[in-house]
A protein has these predicted regions:
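Helix-biased "structured C-terminal domain" signature
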Residues: 1-197
């Protein structure tokens, strides 16, 4: 982590980490980064977060996400926000700079040499909430994947008016055949009669 932060500093990119764990069993670290020499001209503010079994891994995940989204901070490229706010000015992000400083060691951890034990500890820490995992493994590729849902927690969707219905509707329109999409959209209309989508 120190080497990653030093690499940003060498390039003149400012980066700040923030605890976003919110009393959850897993540590979540947010990272906000900007290059003051190019901000507003050829670069933008990048805001990401990482969650992992340990605070250090969560921070590394957030910082590498900054690098992935921001490229080199000088190409006029824009990134698409992935669930978190996209700030145009540091003033919009001022709330991130407020609050106490905490050490990474003070964040929660479920770190264990056995990933199964990490998952069980995280699940236990989420009680009384229930987590559901939907298998999404591609049959030909055979690489195990899943989508995780915890009812009652915020749903990550790129819309100011986030909604599971909006997400399902978009997936229907993008991926289903016309008849299936129409049937699904009728069900959504019944479930969300006054929805904006």
């Amino acid at each position: 982590l120190c080497q990653l932060l030093e690499a940003f500093a060498r390039e003149g990119v400012h980066i700040m980490l923030k605890d976003f764990s919110l009393n959850m069993p897993l540590p979540t670290v947010a990272a906000i980064a900007w290059d003051p020499s190019t901000l507003g001209q050829s670069s933008e503010i990048v805001f990401t977060a990482g969650t992992a079994a340990s605070p250090a891994k969560a921070a590394i995940r957030a910082v590498t996400e900054v690098a992935q989204l921001a490229g080199d901070f000088c190409t006029n490229a824009c990134y698409e926000a992935s669930g978190l706010s996209k700030f145009n000015t540091l003033e919009e992000a001022a709330w991130l700079f407020e609050g106490p400083s905490v050490s990474l060691d003070s964040l929660p951890t479920v770190e264990d040499s056995d990933i199964r034990q990490e998952l069980l500890t995280a699940l236990d820490g989420l009680r009384p909430m229930t987590m559901y995992a939907v298998e999404t493994t591609h049959q030909r590729l055979g690489i195990p994947t899943h989508y995780t849902i915890v009812p009652g927690m915020a749903f990550r969707e790129r819309d100011r008016n986030q909604s599971l219905g909006l997400f399902v509707g978009r997936k229907l329109v993008e991926e289903a055949d016309a008849a299936t999409a129409l049937d699904g959209l009728k069900v959504l209309e019944e479930c969300y009669p006054k929805a904006h989508f």
